[in-house]
Amino acid sequence: MRLLSVLLIGFLCLAGTYAQKYQLSPAYNDPYLTDDKTGTHDFWVQNASLPVFYGFHDWNFQDNSGIMEINGDEMHITGKIYPTVNMGDCHRYNVDLVFKKDKSGNVMPKKELRESAYVPHGPIDPATWKYYTFVQGKWTGFGCDPQNVVFSGAEGGMPLQLGYGANGKNGDNGISVWLIYGYTIVDINCNIRPIITQSPTQPPTQPPTYPPTQPPTQPPTQPPTYPPTYPPTYPPTYPPTYPPTHPPTYPPTYPPTQPPTQPPVQDCSTLECPEGFHCEIVNNRRTCVCDTTVPPTHPPTQSPTYPPTQPPTQPPTYPPTYPPTYPPTQPPRASCDNVRCPRGYHCECNHWENVARCVRNEEPTHRPKPPHHGCRPDSCARGEKCICVRGKIYCIPKTTCDQVRCPRKHHCECNRKGQVFCVPDCPKLTCKQVGCPENHECVSRRGELHCVYVRPPTGRWGDDLSDLGYNQASVEAAIDAYEAQRGQRPHNNIPSNNLHQENNDNLGDGFYDGVEIGFADGGFDVNDLNGF
């Protein structure tokens, strides 16, 4: 009895430390649940131009080496990855990521599928997802030119999410998380499939309590634990031919010398299966079996009908309006496990049509955008620039031309967006090389050339007299006095035969184009104005 208790306690301790393992595979893109064109990768790198990624965006686990092990509250992801675009490339990495179960209960799920895929419109329920926060992780390189990639955390502090539809690509059971390396993001999108391992066989919890069904045919192999009432004088010559009149009232104090003829009955009450699996007894052994039936997205509109227990005695008088009474058998769910595709192709499983096809690998043209950071126009003061590093906002001074030293024959310029550039110097021009428009002339001011407007001459007589050094007001007063003395009208009404001019210009417009003005009766010369 004590031995059985020790064995039972040891088995319970082993069951408490039993770890569940999952096989990781690339998450395919389901066009019925998402508009995203990417998919079928385990890891996707946002900035593949960094030297540690060798120019490759997509990385997958090699030879089904991706394993996710959950032991209590700790998750451990391991495996070997290679670039999917060039499978013959010699760059390889060993993956080692550690996560811890999040128990805060205030995590917002990252929904990357269409809104119609989630409840109440679709079958995916984010309330059933589990979350694991990042602890540590790295890629250790091997092969040619090995390098190491050490991750600093998760984008925005978002944890890894696990469940049906959590991979962000389809509705299967999977995981997804955005890890940070420097200033770039490494996206994980994987489907998971549990690896069924047989748990250790439980010893019998109680000794057998049933009495023997037949009398013993041979004497006991060991002496009884209690002394006999009197010593036997000789061994019996033949076994007794009749059974005992009544069974023993107490169990034996020692374990049976022979094993029981039947194994102990297994019970599913103590075996916990992962999501998507249930316990069944097969050949008297407990095992976790995959759920083959897909739960309906809406309740049935009618109650199911059952086949009749007896055949009808009379044929029906009218044809039935309902479908056959026997339920259709559920076809097996399509799987890519046994499908081998040629080079350059991969297997995709369409659960809506329940078929598995080999499709050509395509270079992804669209990448998921990382979550927007919190930088706003008013986050920093004037002259500072806002940046977001690992989910935190920092204000750094903007670069100006005072802080930039350009090479020889170059100078610094700053555009409207505050960006600073070193541009080559232009050769200096002279006014002889600049062509200005009409009525403009070239002028050099502070080392810069400008075309300025030059007012053309108006041709008025006052301007000509002023150019000769006469005062315009005095000249007009002298002309008015002279005309008043002669008793004549102003010059614009003088007949054209009473005056003459050197240039024979028309005086009807009221302006004197020439300098000399003469009259027929003796004349008036401009030199006579010296007395005024």
Curated annotation (Swiss-Prot):
Compartments where found: Spore wall
Which residues are tagged as glycosylated in the record?
N47
Point out the signal peptide segment: 1-19
In the UniProt record, does the keyword Signal occur?
yes
SMART domains given in the database record: FOLN (SM00274)
Q: Does the keyword Aminoacyl-tRNA synthetase apply?
A: no
- Cite the Follistatin-like domain residue spans from the record: 267-289, 335-359, 400-423, 430-452
Name the chain's protein.
Answer: Spore coat protein SP85
Species name = Dictyostelium discoideum
Lineage, broadest ranks: Eukaryota, Amoebozoa, Evosea, Eumycetozoa, Dictyostelia
Gene from which this protein is expressed: pspB
